[in-house]
Amino acid sequence: MGRLLRAARLPPLLSPLLLLLVGGAFLGACVAGSDEPGPEGLTSTSLLDLLLPTGLEPLDSEEPSETMGLGAGLGAPGSGFPSEENEESRILQPPQYFWEEEEELNDSSLDLGPTADYVFPDLTEKAGSIEDTSQAQELPNLPSPLPKMNLVEPPWHMPPREEEEEEEEEEEREKEEVEKQEEEEEEELLPVNGSQEEAKPQVRDFSLTSSSQTPGATKSRHEDSGDQASSGVEVESSMGPSLLLPSVTPTTVTPGDQDSTSQEAEATVLPAAGLGVEFEAPQEASEEATAGAAGLSGQHEEVPALPSFPQTTAPSGAEHPDEDPLGSRTSASSPLAPGDMELTPSSATLGQEDLNQQLLEGQAAEAQSRIPWDSTQVICKDWSNLAGKNYIILNMTENIDCEVFRQHRGPQLLALVEEVLPRHGSGHHGAWHISLSKPSEKEQHLLMTLVGEQGVVPTQDVLSMLGDIRRSLEEIGIQNYSTTSSCQARASQVRSDYGTLFVVLVVIGAICIIIIALGLLYNCWQRRLPKLKHVSHGEELRFVENGCHDNPTLDVASDSQSEMQEKHPSLNGGGALNGPGSWGALMGGKRDPEDSDVFEEDTHL
């Protein structure tokens, strides 16, 4: 009863006004959809099918409003209470419309917003950059699951039979066009068709998944009829991928196509000339595609199969709608680019390797062609053949065999000699040759003779020629050169080398002898020093003892003996005191007590 009273309080004029507004809006949408078809073959039926997820929801909210408006009009004007018939009609009505009525009436304007603001700009303004001939195959697949939903069709909607007939006709036309285009492509692009047929089921699977997402969103919206505003947002998010996902494809398709064209142009392995049309995609389409991709990456996290979307469309059909069907079909077959792109770099590298191999083979052929010509003028002979001739000794930087030098550095030596020969007025080209020989395997020497038409060229002329190219000879491993007359000088030079070595050894030996002599002198000096130190040390001790104790140890006996000898004559001759030894007697007389003390000290010791 509370619900009935709450429904009766609504003003009777509000529901008719809302009905008029909703009907007018959808009639305008129908007229706009029928007058302005899509640029890529979109019909009014396809537009209506796309509008079903958003347009059916307000229609569900219209029927309860109609019944409520009629029921409210049946009440008595003056009594303020509904009549019995009005109450019976309200009781028979499903109860869910009573408590949903206020929210549906308040939120019906929210449902009109996305349909008017979101759907039509995407289909009219951005159709040039979004739609493609390959999308024309997808669009009939989108409305196929929609008639299965238990939804209330609007009064202006076409019956399903007519729609099915039109869809079947369109599909038949498209199939015929596709078959014609495939026949033409099979003649021109035989390697392309294999991957193209693999791309078709992916396109259809994507169309089925996108179409299955939209009815799922509408079903969940009807189940959660309490939150109409949130369901409107879900409608936008569910319709977003189905309409805007093709805009993501230019960013992923165009760079790969351009790279593949550049790589195929470098390798000169272009499989078909018809593909050149679709690769001319302007930067504006790619910029719009990047913007659309950035928007989708933030809005739709629920779609996990975005990396597979580039296999559905290509931007060439959107930018060039007036192209022949072959160009549009090649744009639809552009998903095979990733498969072919993996093969083109290898082909390009193979092409470059082939070119490099050809160049190397050409150089090797030229070198091989020169070797026989050089071998006739640069010859290795035995040492016995050069004995007694005016040969020149070439001192090499390394121990190299004659044959190895002839093969690797003989042409360079020949070229250097050819440059110098005209200056010295020697024979013409081909009238002379160079003979080389190695006297011993251990020495880094080669013997060279220059033989002309008149015989062996004198060594002085050869030396003058080699003097002009001395720096160039160092580059090919010839350190210096000498003549046969300087062979003895070379031996003496070796001897002089030994002499210098001997001199160095003698000098080093002399230095060692000097060092040894100095060592012996130092040892002798060290032996003399202890003796000198011992003597001086004894004298110092005696002096110290005499100075400290006044005790002349060695002189005591001598003094006492002298005093004893002096006393005897003094006793015998009494006048001896005045004689020359009187001073000793006086000193002895004075030292008597000291002498007794000394003897006492000696006894103590």
Curated annotation (Swiss-Prot):
The keyword Translocase belongs to this UniProt entry's keyword annotation: no
Spans traversing the lipid bilayer: 501-521
Result for mutant: residue 97 to F: Remains sulfated. Not sulfated and reduced rolling of Jurkat T-cells by more than 50%. The rolling of Jurkat T-cells is reduced by more than 80%
Ranges per topology, Extracellular: 33-500
Residue positions, PTM Sulfotyrosine: 97, 118
PTM comment: O-glycosylated; contains chondroitin sulfate. Displays sialylated O-linked oligosaccharides. Sulfation is necessary for interaction with SELL. Sialylated O-linked oligosaccharides are necessary for interaction with SELL, SELE and SELP.
Listed Gly residues bias regions: 572-582
UniProt-listed GO biological process terms: leukocyte tethering or rolling
Polar residues bias spans: 207-217
The organism's place on the tree of life at top rank: Eukaryota
Region (Disordered): 129-347, 554-605
Location(s) in or outside the cell: Membrane
Keywords (A to Z) from UniProt: Cell adhesion, Disulfide bond, Glycoprotein, Membrane, Phosphoprotein, Proteoglycan, Sialic acid, Signal, Sulfation, Transmembrane, Transmembrane helix
Compositionally biased intervals (Low complexity): 241-255, 288-298
Glycan attachment sites: 79, 144, 193, 395
UniProt topology in membrane: Single-pass type I membrane protein
Signal peptide: 1-32
Keyword Disulfide bond: yes
Subunit text: Homodimer; disulfide-linked. Interacts with SELL, SELE and SELP.
Similarity remark: Belongs to the podocalyxin family.
Function (record text): Acts as a ligand for vascular selectins. Mediates rapid rolling of leukocytes over vascular surfaces through high affinity divalent cation-dependent interactions with E-, P- and L-selectins.
PANTHER family registered for this protein in UniProt: PODOCALYXIN-LIKE PROTEIN 2
Protein name: Podocalyxin-like protein 2
